[in-house]
């Protein structure tokens, strides 16, 4: 059984409820040299868009860093908790110092603050959003990621209690409910890996949904169409036409007709029509089916 951590969870919820991500009005802002800061171990960002980083650097060069970085002291160094993108852009802009607010934060609190800032990005893709919110849920409930995922689905059916209130508080700050997240977005993590990678690269969720719900043998074809600019209606239309990517072989028919999943999904009239066709099918197809059996 997973051991819960109620005291640490209260500390985390206090951070979420009382420490704003917008630190521009803090009364203890100070300046630190950029070379005295290091990337935080709790940062959720995987990469930075160089073009957007350059644009931010130009803005900083003209107006300065308007939003202080949130940092903490770790082993005699200052570690960035929130604001790594501004720190990198400030270096590109040639700044020697950046404004910071220093807080004493645990690893768990620092991770939560970094996640919250990351989730407020304008260009956040849906996979980073789902990953970040699931990790925030795990921190809130004091569970590992996969355990939190299972627990979230259990809470949808459970009588409201302490955990419901904690999740309500966390998601309220993000303008969403955890129930909506659990019902509509959490399932995305079950989609095929190529679709997840495409979503992370910017593919719209509406297109990814069509690809993920298509038969496995059509997904690569549809994903390529989506990445080349096809609309949702065009993907749905393509799904209604036979695949043009490869010739249909007797072996392919045999594989489909030998699939229990395929056969169990047929209604009675379709199954009867298939039986009639099988009674007069070509010998080459019959041999292929026998080989698949």
Curated annotation (Swiss-Prot):
<dbReference type="InterPro" id="IPR050336">
    <property type="entry name" value="Chromosome_partition/occlusion"/>
</dbReference>
<dbReference type="InterPro" id="IPR003115">
    <property type="entry name" value="ParB/Sulfiredoxin_dom"/>
</dbReference>
<comment type="function">
    <text>Involved in chromosome partition. Localize to both poles of the predivisional cell following completion of DNA replication. Binds to the DNA origin of replication.</text>
</comment>
<dbReference type="InterPro" id="IPR036086">
    <property type="entry name" value="ParB/Sulfiredoxin_sf"/>
</dbReference>
<comment type="similarity">
    <text>Belongs to the ParB family.</text>
</comment>
<dbReference type="Pfam" id="PF02195">
    <property type="entry name" value="ParBc"/>
</dbReference>
<keyword id="KW-0159">Chromosome partition</keyword>
<dbReference type="GO" id="GO:0005694">
    <property type="term" value="C:chromosome"/>
</dbReference>
<dbReference type="GO" id="GO:0007059">
    <property type="term" value="P:chromosome segregation"/>
</dbReference>
<dbReference type="GO" id="GO:0003677">
    <property type="term" value="F:DNA binding"/>
</dbReference>
<dbReference type="InterPro" id="IPR004437">
    <property type="entry name" value="ParB/RepB/Spo0J"/>
</dbReference>
<protein>
    <recommendedName>
        <fullName>Probable chromosome 2-partitioning protein ParB</fullName>
    </recommendedName>
</protein>
<keyword id="KW-0238">DNA-binding</keyword>
């Amino acid at each position: 059984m997973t051991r819960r951590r109620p005291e640490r969870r209260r500390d985390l919820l206090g951070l979420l409820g009382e420490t704003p991500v917008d630190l521009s009005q803090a009364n203890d802002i100070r300046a630190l040299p950029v070379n005295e800061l290091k990337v935080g171990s709790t940062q959720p960002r995987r990469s930075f868009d160089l073009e957007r980083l350059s644009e931010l650097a130009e803005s900083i060069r003209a107006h300065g860093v308007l939003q202080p970085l949130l940092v903490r002291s770790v082993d005699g160094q200052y570690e960035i908790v929130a604001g790594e993108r501004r720190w990198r852009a400030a270096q590109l802009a040639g700044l020697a110092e950046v404004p910071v607010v220093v807080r004493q934060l645990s690893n768990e609190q620092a991770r939560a603050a970094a996640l919250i800032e990351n989730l407020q990005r304008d260009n956040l893709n849906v996979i980073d959003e789902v990953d970040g919110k699931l990790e925030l849920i795990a921190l809130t409930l004091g569970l590992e990621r996969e355990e939190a995922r299972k627990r979230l689905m259990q809470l949808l059916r459970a009588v409201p209690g302490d955990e419901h209130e904690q999740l309500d508080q966390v998601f309220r700050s993000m303008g969403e409910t955890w129930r909506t997240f659990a019902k509509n977005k959490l399932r995305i993590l079950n989609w095929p890996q190529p679709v997840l990678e495409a979503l992370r690269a910017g593919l719209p969720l509406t297109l990814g949904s069509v690809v993920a719900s298509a038969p496995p043998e059509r997904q690569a074809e549809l994903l390529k169409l989506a990445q080349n600019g096809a609309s949702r209606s065009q993907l749905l239309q393509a799904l209604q036409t036979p695949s043009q990517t490869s010739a249909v072989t007797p072996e392919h028919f045999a594989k489909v007709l030998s699939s229990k999943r395929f056969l169990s999904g047929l209604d009675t009239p379709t199954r009867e029509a298939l039986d009639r066709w099988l009674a007069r099918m070509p010998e080459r197809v019959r041999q292929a089916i026998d080989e698949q059996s």
